[in-house]
Swiss-Prot record:
Function description: Catalyzes the reversible transfer of the terminal phosphate group between ATP and AMP. Plays an important role in cellular energy homeostasis and in adenine nucleotide metabolism.
EC assignment: 2.7.4.3
Residues reported in the UniProt entry to bind ATP: 10-15, 123, 132-133, 203
Keyword tags: ATP-binding, Cytoplasm, Kinase, Nucleotide biosynthesis, Nucleotide-binding, Transferase
This protein's pathway: Purine metabolism; AMP biosynthesis via salvage pathway; AMP from ADP: step 1/1
Main location: cytoplasm
Catalytic function, reaction form: AMP + ATP = 2 ADP
Cellular compartment(s): Cytoplasm
Protein name according to UniProt: Adenylate kinase
Species per Swiss-Prot/TrEMBL record: Variovorax paradoxus (strain S110)
């Protein structure tokens, strides 16, 4: 099973990716995780990426493609993989097509932007442990404090409403066109194109999971 998971930032791709990867025994390839690891390590590419991400922009194609090409060459990708957050742009999709990367499905998780803003701007985290909360959906026992240590929770810059809105704007301009790209390719050349499927990403985690797994068996 080789697939791309599409959807706006905050659409719940990471949660559903974990279920899909478990079901099919494939690795999740998240450019976000790869970038955060580079930022944490303080590599030159990581430092570049940090400045771009904190301004709400997207990292360059060259940097992302170098990370991804290296990743899918690893042995654990032999039986398939799930791309979460890649490709982000038409040029990236073209580059992947040109490289002959075989894909079975493109699955879109569709969530209204108003829901995404509420989801993301309400996130809070405890930096030392990585524990996460949500002011509405998963609040801490004491407002603004970690349940275990009582230490202050923070709002990541990535989750501030202004940054979220900027990221959604960038998504609309650069990544949303991939929906048309893959659906048009599937209609024009069904023999070689991945199957394109879209599901609603609003509802319980379990409901969305069942929609996703049903879409990937159709």
């Amino acid at each position: 099973m080789r697939l791309i998971l599409l959807g706006a930032p905050g659409a719940g791709k990471g949660t559903q990716a974990a279920f899909i990867c478990q079901k099919y025994g494939i690795p999740q390839i998240s450019t976000g995780d790869m970038l955060r690891a580079a930022v944490k390590a303080g590599t030159p590419l990581g430092q570049q990426a940090k400045a771009v991400m904190e301004s709400g922009g997207l990292v360059s194609d060259d940097l992302i493609i170098n990370l991804v090409k290296e990743r899918i060459a690893q042995p654990d990708c032999a039986g398939g993989f799930l791309f979460d957050g890649f490709p982000r742009t038409i040029p990236q999709a073209d580059a992947m097509k040109a490289a002959g990367v075989k894909l079975d499905y493109v699955l879109e998780i569709d969530v209204p932007f108003s829901d995404i803003i509420e989801r993301m701007s309400g996130r809070r985290s405890h930096p030392a442990s990585g524990r996460t909360y949500h002011v509405k959906f998963n609040p801490p026992k004491v407002e603004g404090k970690d349940d275990i240590t009582g230490e202050d929770l923070i709002q990541r810059k990535d989750d501030e409403e202004e940054t979220v809105r900027k990221r959604l704007e960038v998504y609309s301009q650069q990544t949303r066109p991939l929906v048309d790209y893959y659906s048009a390719w599937a209609k024009a050349d069904p023999a070689s194109a991945p199957k394109y499927r879209a599901i609603q990403g609003v509802g319980s985690v379990e409901e969305i999971k069942q929609r996703a797994l049903a879409a990937l068996s159709s």
